[in-house]
Amino acid sequence: MTDASFLDTGVALGYCFRDDTHHYRCREYLEENGFSLYISDHVEDEYLNREPDLAEEIADGIRDHIFQLQNSDYEGQLDSMDTSQIRQNLVGNNNASTSLHDFYRNQVTNFIQLEELIKRLRELSRDIEQNAIENRQWLLARTEIWSRKNDYSEIDEALSEIPWDDRRICLDAHDVVEQRGEITELATVNPRDLVDEGYRELILGQTALEDVVSLAVRS
């Protein structure tokens, strides 16, 4: 049985942003398993660098939806049929589609004025980054930031066909096993470079990791 999981950047982003394609699988994995969690210091840095831009992209998706509403034929009081049509015709597959569908499903009453709807949508756009920050704080409270000292040059060479950013995470996760003695798996949303084409078997053959687990939602 696995004692610990080492997370790549995509898993952290997937958990913290519910509009991320992999959010629900990442959330289930992190909240329903009781093992120790680790991320590397460079994963933390990469996450913090990307968080504001991703939040802005999602907020822009909500603002685009507001613009569509303002330029539509809807006006005055909307009923449940109107809001159902809005969900079907105006939400689309933009960067905020998950948040928007959840908003219409759970926060919009059967009757609502268009102005009130737009007001609430603006509030939703402002909350995107704060929600991600709160999720990140929850995650970091459960996670140990790991700094590797050993370069493991022989393993690094054996994994050389794997891109460096992914290879580095493999070495970081291997270091946890070496230093802590915990049965550890690597969790990723990037199966192309860490699971597919024999990469999983290569990693398990060259490192002390128990498994490489893909949380990716594939199309």
Regions found by a protein language model. Give the residues of each.
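Acidic, PIN/NYN-like endoribonuclease modules and their adjacent C-terminal/linker elements
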Residues: 4, 158, 162-163, 170, ...
